[in-house]
Each structure stands twice: as C-alpha cells, then as structure tokens.
UniProtKB/Swiss-Prot annotation:
Belongs to the radical SAM superfamily. Lipoyl synthase family. HAMAP family: Lipoyl_synth. [4Fe-4S] cluster 2 binds at C94, C98, C101. Keywords: 4Fe-4S, Cytoplasm, Iron, Iron-sulfur, Metal-binding, S-adenosyl-L-methionine, Transferase. CDD domains: Radical_SAM. [4Fe-4S] cluster 1 binds at C68, C73, C79, S308. SUPFAM superfamilies: Radical SAM enzymes. Gene3D superfamilies: Aldolase class I. Residues 80-297 form the Radical SAM core domain. The lineage of its organism: Bacteria, Pseudomonadati, Pseudomonadota, Gammaproteobacteria, Vibrionales. It comes from Vibrio cholerae serotype O1 (strain ATCC 39315 / El Tor Inaba N16961). It catalyses: [[Fe-S] cluster scaffold protein carrying a second [4Fe-4S](2+) cluster] + N(6)-octanoyl-L-lysyl-[protein] + 2 oxidized [2Fe-2S]-[ferredoxin] + 2 S-adenosyl-L-methionine + 4 H(+) = [[Fe-S] cluster scaffold protein] + N(6)-[(R)-dihydrolipoyl]-L-lysyl-[protein] + 4 Fe(3+) + 2 hydrogen sulfide + 2 5'-deoxyadenosine + 2 L-methionine + 2 reduced [2Fe-2S]-[ferredoxin]. This is Lipoyl synthase.
C-alpha cells in the first residue's frame, strides 16, 4: 500500500498525485483504450504569435493566472490571438480534486490582497472590453472567496468604467448566504456557474459538489439580481445520455437560467476521466434547438465550446460553435 500524500501549502498536485486523493478511484487509461479523435475534433492550432506572448507576459508581470493555461484549454491559442483571456483569481491551487479538471489540487496560499488592483490594471493595459473572471474552489475561506470576487469587480470597474464583467464562480459550498451577501453591492454583468454534467454522474465527475445546491445558487442569485443574466455550462462525452442533458436544461430554465454552453469533454491526461464518446456536431445542433425551445435566450453548443469561449459574443447572442 502506498503512503498517503502529505500535502504542503502552496504545492500543486496534478495528474496521478491529484487522482490519488480522490475517493472514487480512476484507473489510468491505457493508450490502446483511448478513443481516437474524429475528424471534427482535429483543429490546426495557430502559430505562437506575438499577441499570445504579450498576454502571457502581462499575466506573469502581475503574478496573475489564466484558466486558459491552468486548465489546458484547447482554445488557448485562438482566444489569446483574439486578445481575450479568462482570469483565474485566488491562486492556481484548488481545494477540490475533480477528475475531469486539469487545475492543480492542494493547500492554497492565502489570497493576495493586491490581486484585485493588479487585475484591474492588467485589464486596463490590455484594453479589454469584456472580461471573464473565474477562480479555483476555496473551501478554506469563510466566504469561499466571494468577497475577493466582489473586490475584483469593484476595482476593475473603477479603472475600466465601460467594461462588461462575467464571473464564473465555484459553488460556495456551505457558504451560499454569506457569499451572495458579499456579492450584493458589486455583482457582475453575467453570473455563471457550471453544473458540468447530469446529476447521475456527480459522484464520479464532481466529488464534493451537489447538483441541487448548484441549481439553488443560480436561483438565489437571480432572485437577488433579476436584471443580471445567469449562465451555466455542461460537458458532453462523460457517459451521460441525451435525455439526461435535456432534463438538466429543463432544471436550469426552472431556476431562471437563460444562457447556456455545451461542449465536448476532453481528457487532460490518461490519469483523468476518459472520454466515453465524441458527440457529433449535429447532436450539439439538436440540443441547441431544444435549449432555444425551452426558453434559453443564448445557447452556444459545439465540440469546442467552453464556458468562457468567445464569452463576449455569447453575451451578445451571436453564433458561437
């Protein structure tokens, strides 16, 4: 029997080390068992442009993180080339250990007090008009990090008065009331919280999360801020059925959510949950039609869609695939 990992504060645990900490064990996928990517999942990545280097340099200068890099997003090159990025606040170490996610797990350091000001200045320097702010889960904080989100919103608007801010928040497990109170005076322009998958798969995909809790977070925020759109996203290809996804869409609408993203799950490594199937583009198109029929005002559905992929276009209701 191997010794349990003794986590040190500020150390990132990834891949096999991270998966070893999950109660539901996921055996590494052998190369011969990995599903071959279909043609529609093969994209030509743009060259490592100067724009990409400039954005990375701006991040490093102010000790900031992008979820694009930390979660190994396949759209990084495209988004960076277009001058957009999703900033990840509260550090790059998550207190959760979801087996689909490539963000490192461990004992995070205390939040950096100057991060909101640094973030606001970086956004100003990059001349962004729409920004997405997300974070790792911070179960070690009394409010789950909600006040830090509010501080970032306030500082960003102070330097960038015409900007639109979308926040992609964690579930604030056990801290919903205090978290929503912290966000009360500085809400975002779009409030995003991902359900990720169907409730049947939560124990495997989102250990530590609760489907009904996440729905309630979306409902309560909308109740307190009726003019702020709420948004959620799901991954496809983890073993869910189309019928289960439709039921989740109905639940989201019943809780006031009007913006939706559906995308293909891609395993970051053989140590993560394997891809059960690659969903054809036509099926994404069908689900988009279902979503619009259910009353979603915006639905971005396609193999490469992610929560923050072209989020500015999503917010305008433009086509994103």
């Amino acid at each position: 029997m191997s010794k349990p990992i003794q986590m040190e504060r500020g150390v990132k645990y990834r891949d096999a080390d991270k998966m070893a900490l999950i109660p539901i064990k996921n055996m590494p996928t052998e190369q011969k068992e990995v599903l071959r990517k279909p043609e529609w999942m093969k994209i030509k990545l743009p060259a490592d442009s100067q724009r990409i280097q400039d954005i990375k340099a701006a991040m490093r200068k102010n000790n900031l993180h992008s979820v694009c890099e930390e979660a190994s997003c396949p759209n990084l090159a495209e988004c960076f080339n277009h001058g957009t990025a999703t900033f990840m606040i509260l550090g790059a170490i998550c207190t959760r250990r979801c087996p689909f996610c490539d963000v490192a797990h461990g004992r995070p350091n205390a939040p950096e007090a100057e991060e909101p000001k640094k973030l606001a200045q970086t956004i100003h320097d990059m001349k962004l008009k729409y920004v997405v702010i997300t974070s790792v889960d911070r179960d070690d904080l009394r409010d789950g990090g909600a006040q830090h989100f509010a501080d970032c919103n306030r500082e960003i608007r102070a330097l960038n008065p015409h900007i639109k801010i979308e926040t992609l928040v964690p579930d604030f497990r056990g801290r919903m009331e205090v978290a929503l109170e912290a966000l009360k005076d500085n809400p975002p322009d779009v409030f995003n919280h991902n359900l990720e998958t169907a409730p049947r798969l939560y124990r495997k995909v989102r250990p530590g999360a609760n489907y009904k809790w996440s729905l309630e977070l979306l409902r309560q925020f909308k109740e307190q801020h009726p003019h702020v759109p709420t948004k959620s996203g799901l991954m496809m290809g983890l073993g869910e059925t189309k019928e289960e996804i439709v039921e989740v869409l109905k639940d989201l609408r019943a809780h006031g959510v009007t913006m939706l993203t559906l995308g293909q799950y891609l395993a970051p490594s053989r140590h993560h949950l394997p891809v059960e199937r690659y969903v054809p583009p036509a099926e994404f198109d069908e689900l988009k039609e279902v979503a619009l029929e259910l009353g979603f005002t915006h639905a971005a559905c396609g193999p490469f869609v992610r929560s923050s992929y072209h989020a500015d276009l999503q917010a305008k209701g433009l086509e994103v695939k």
